[in-house]
Amino acid sequence: MAKPSGKSTTKKKVKKTVVDGIAHIHASFNNTIVTITDRQGNTLSWATAGGSGFRGSRKSTPFAAQVAAERAGQAAQDYGLKNLDVEVKGPGPGRESAVRALNNIGYKVNNITDVTPIPHNGCRPPKKRRV
């Protein structure tokens, strides 16, 4: 028979407070992914244009990227985040609007870096489309 225990010993999960973070914006031609991490690279929050309710060609618009950045930024504010470094990757249409949205939420954007991978003549690119 089980013993009746006097007190449960479960701990409440405490959210860590992070002041400085990095916003990684991956803007492809079809979608925009915004991930907010701490300085070590541990993910605090993320959002995508597709996950924000946009489907099809509307997913690849600057407005969809703005909504995704706002959703990721609001979720990261629970950690006490104040300062952001922004790393933008890719040629998509949502690059500038996502950075602007993070700035409008109230984050202090320290610097914006373009980390788009550029090959030094590496792999052969796919052939051009003939429509």
UniProtKB/Swiss-Prot annotation:
InterPro entries: Ribosomal_uS11, Ribosomal_uS11_bac-type, Ribosomal_uS11_sf. GO terms for molecular function: rRNA binding; structural constituent of ribosome. GO terms for biological process: translation. Keywords: Ribonucleoprotein, Ribosomal protein, RNA-binding, rRNA-binding. Signal peptide: none annotated. Transmembrane segments: none annotated. One of its GO terms (cellular component) is ribosome. The keyword Ribosomal protein applies. HAMAP family: Ribosomal_uS11. Part of the 30S ribosomal subunit. Interacts with proteins S7 and S18. Binds to IF-3. Belongs to the universal ribosomal protein uS11 family. Located on the platform of the 30S subunit, it bridges several disparate RNA helices of the 16S rRNA. Forms part of the Shine-Dalgarno cleft in the 70S ribosome. This is Small ribosomal subunit protein uS11.
